[in-house]
């Protein structure tokens, strides 16, 4: 059985630690799902986010992103990554372990 780690990101800090954690999990064969919400959606406009491409399954709260008036053109995420809290709820259900930043 594959292991899955869920990461809930509400803070606009610690992107470097998040990236290192995701890379370490991938190296160990652990699938990772990350959901960005509230202030955490600010990280989605950071160019460093590209380091997560192909490593993790990423979604972000569309309402949170829009409420902060962030620029969609500044993110490398695909339009399909914009989601709702229901994705977060499914992530909790599907994951073996769950962390919050």
PLM regions: where:
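A short beta-strand-loop structural module common to alpha/beta enzyme folds
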Residues: 31-40
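Hydrophobic anchor at the start of a short beta-strand
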Residues: 5, 32, 58
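Histidine-anchored nucleotide/phosphate-binding helix
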Residues: 14-27, 34
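A glycine-rich helix N-cap at a beta->alpha junction
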Residues: 48-75
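C-terminal structural segments of small proteins and small subunits
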Residues: 73-101
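Short, glycine-rich nucleotide/cofactor-binding loops
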Residues: 4-16, 38-39
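Short, well-ordered alpha-helix to beta-strand connector turns
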Residues: 29, 55-56, 95-96
């Amino acid at each position: 059985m594959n292991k899955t780690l869920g990461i809930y990101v509400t803070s606009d800090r610690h992107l470097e630690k998040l990236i290192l954690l995701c890379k370490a999990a991938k190296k160990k064969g652990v699938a990772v799902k990350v959901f960005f919400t509230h202030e955490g959606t600010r990280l989605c406009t950071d160019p460093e986010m590209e380091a997560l491409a192909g490593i993790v399954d990423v979604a972000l709260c569309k309402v949170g992103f829009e409420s902060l008036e962030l620029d969609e053109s500044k993110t490398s995420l695909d339009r399909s990554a914009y989601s709702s809290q229901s994705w977060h709820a499914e992530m909790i259900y599907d994951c073996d372990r769950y962390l919050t930043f």
